[in-house]
A protein has these predicted regions:
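Short alpha-helical segments that sit at the start of domains
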Residues: 48-78
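Alpha-helix boundary/capping and short turn/kink residues
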Residues: 73, 88, 100-103
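Short acidic, hydrophobic short linear motifs in intrinsically disordered regions
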Residues: 79, 88-97
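Short amphipathic alpha-helical interaction segments
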Residues: 100-114
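A short, conserved structural fragment
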Residues: 114-124
């Protein structure tokens, strides 16, 4: 075999190794975490998810920290609770519900919520919690209340 053939064979082995299935640890060895819900806010919604506990710890922190930070202010939490309970709302209604005196304050908080995909603006300019986020957000609020000792 020539040097050229040796190099081709070596490259083929490397490609095969890269394309082969890597050893994947058992995703449930550390256990499973899950949540579910069925609610009637703005129509019937149902959601269920189960995910490996170890996998949860391996997900990148950036996106989840953005969501937690967006909810980490009392005004933003009030906006989210109001939107879940009442559906899509125009900015003036949100400002009133959150007890804000200026639209500048409201838009400051909405910017954080929209950037984290917790809230979206619909085609009419109103704001809403995306239907796919309603139950996960309710679970987060419930879990935070549990950690804070409010449910016991």
């Amino acid at each position: 075999m020539s040097d050229y053939d040796d190099r081709i064979a070596d490259l083929e082995r490397r490609v095969a190794a890269l394309e082969g299935k890597a050893a994947v640890p058992d995703p449930v060895a550390a256990g499973i975490v899950g949540y579910q819900g069925e609610v009637e806010f703005g129509g019937p919604l149902s959601w269920q998810i189960r995910f490996g506990a170890a996998g949860t710890l391996q997900l990148p922190d950036g996106p989840r920290v953005d969501v937690l930070a967006a909810l980490g202010h009392p005004v933003r939490a009030a906006i989210v609770r109001h939107l879940i309970a009442n559906g899509a709302q125009p900015a003036p209604a949100l400002s009133e519900a959150a007890g804000l005196r200026s639209t500048g304050q409201l838009y400051h908080h909405l910017k954080s919520l929209v950037a984290a995909k917790v809230v979206e603006q619909d085609s009419r300019g109103s704001y809403q919690v995306p239907p796919t986020a309603v139950i996960p957000l309710l679970v987060m609020l419930t879990a935070a209340s549990d950690v804070a000792g409010q449910l016991r």
